[in-house]
């Protein structure tokens, strides 16, 4: 979805240029303002996600992996069966 949004938002309509906004009908002006807000929000989300990815990558690199060479014996999860009894 991010690729689709980037392609759409990167090419705002020429009618939404600040020089043309005064000449536009109010409804079209509202659409242009909404598109501008969506573009700003999208770029802020991309920068936030980029910051999070950098933080997570650094966090994972700082944790050493434990490799004892022994298969784990503990129970990590429980399988539950739902439905009718046979």
From Swiss-Prot:
Keyword Signal recorded = yes
Give residues where Pyrrolidone carboxylic acid occurs: 73
What are the entry keywords?
Amidation, Cleavage on pair of basic residues, Neuropeptide, Pyrrolidone carboxylic acid, Secreted, Signal
Main localization of the protein? secreted
What GO cellular-component annotations does this UniProt entry give?
extracellular region
Q: Name one GO biological process term.
A: neuropeptide signaling pathway
Give the location in the cell. Secreted
Give the range the annotation lists for the signal sequence: 1-18
Q: Which domain of life is it from?
A: Eukaryota
Please list the residues that make up the propeptide. 19-70
User: In the record, which positions carry Phenylalanine amide?
Assistant: 82
Disulfide partners: none
Family note? Belongs to the myosuppressin family.
What functional role does this protein have? Myoinhibiting neuropeptide.
Instruction: Give the protein name, as stated in the record.
Output: Myosuppressin
The species this protein was found in: Apis mellifera
Q: What is the lineage of its organism?
A: Eukaryota, Metazoa, Ecdysozoa, Arthropoda, Hexapoda
């Amino acid at each position: 979805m991010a690729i689709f949004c980037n392609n759409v938002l990167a090419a705002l309509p020429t009618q939404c240029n600040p020089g043309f906004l005064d000449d536009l009908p109010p409804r079209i002006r509202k659409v242009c303002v909404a598109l501008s807000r969506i573009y700003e929000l999208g770029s802020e989300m991309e920068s936030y996600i980029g910051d999070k990815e950098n933080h997570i990558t650094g966090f994972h690199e700082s944790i050493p992996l434990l490799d004892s060479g022994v298969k784990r014996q503990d129970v990590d999860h429980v399988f539950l069966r739902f439905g009718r009894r046979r």
